[in-house]
Amino acid sequence: MTKYTAVLFDLDGTLVDTAPDLGFALNTLLQQEGYSPIPHQLIRPEASNGSAGLLGLGFNITAADANYLPLQQRFIKLYQDNITRESDLFSGIALLLKQLEDTNIPWGIITNKPAFLTTPLVTQLGLDKRAACVISGDTTAHSKPHPAPMLYACELISQTPENCIYIGDAERDIKAGKNANMTTVIARYGYISSSDNIKDWQADGIIDHPSELLQWL
């Protein structure tokens, strides 16, 4: 019998493919500023890094630049207005969630996305009433890789960290899970760039398709 009694997911790049809408917002902003759009295949690996990563890619700026904040505010508004334009569950996630629910294994979401973006996204995708918990980047005082959101999720779903699997597509996800003593799994199908050496993350496992997670349960 499996020791795992709950599965917790990162959101962008693990549970939901949000790169198309993040890319749409970035390219719309670029075109408004007179620049050419960026190909989707270049945007995708940055999609897990939020506005900082995407604006860095598109405009070659950092948060220290004077025009960063105005561009960030416009980017977020564009994304917010198009948050489920194309975003959808990754292939295989719908079946995985159904199988978890059919076997009474609670599942939840732990993301660094702020609540004002997380809530409409999960609600419009019909996940809000199904997830046992939804932890956003500003739900607790610290975000991933700090263990605080992980431990708070466990508290909400009445599970011990040692009995939880956390699956994500970024190094901070794996660090957060390990910091909370969870079993960690890398979603290699997510937003991982060619420069990421995921073996260095020292996760407990790697999957290339959501269905492979069932082997752990």
Task: Enumerate the predicted regions with their spans.
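Asp-based, Mg2+/Mn2+-dependent phosphohydrolase catalytic module
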Residues: 1-5, 41, 101, 115, ...
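N-terminal helical cap/lid subdomain that shapes the substrate entry/recognition surface
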Residues: 2-95, 101-103, 114-116, 127
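Glycine-centered flexibility sites
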Residues: 13, 48-50, 92, 108, ...
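Conserved SAM-binding loop
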Residues: 15, 89, 107-110, 142, ...
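A generic structural signal for short
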Residues: 15, 84-85, 106-107, 138, ...
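Conserved short hydrophobic patches within well-ordered secondary structure
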Residues: 22, 47-48, 75-76, 110, ...
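Residue-level detector of anion-binding/catalytic polar loops
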Residues: 36, 106, 183
